[in-house]
Amino acid sequence: MNKFFLEIITPEKTFYRGDVESIQIPAVGGDCMIMAGHQPMVFATQPGMIAITADGQRREAFMSEGFIEVRPDATIAFSQAVEWPEDIDERRAEEAKERAEEMVRRNRSAAEYQLNRLALQRAFARLRVKPRGNKE
């Protein structure tokens, strides 16, 4: 299978850097599968699960909001946070979900509602990814 270079960057670190066969990304309009030779494009991502396939092994992780640029020579994703399932603090994610649910209920404006809804999406996505782990 053809490979392409993938780099996933957060404000704190380079989460992933290497050649892959594919990556599935939670795009704002729905999941997007990127493979070698994909048409160049830029799109926004939303909180959810990513799946990276490298050397025939599929590995899943949580990805927060951000954007991705697909170029002929590389694909680069920028995200606020990306975590492997084993690095997700389930208790912290559950607490964040409860706080976000409360804030959504008490929202004061459309802007607050959108921010709180995004926080809730992040918490739900982390909790969905945590028990899944790796698929081999």
Where in this protein do the model-derived segments appear?
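N-terminal export/targeting signal detector
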Residues: M1-F5, R132
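Acidic/glycine-rich phosphate/pyrophosphate-binding loops and surrounding catalytic core
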Residues: W84-E136
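Compact, glycine-rich, soluble single-domain proteins
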Residues: F5-R99
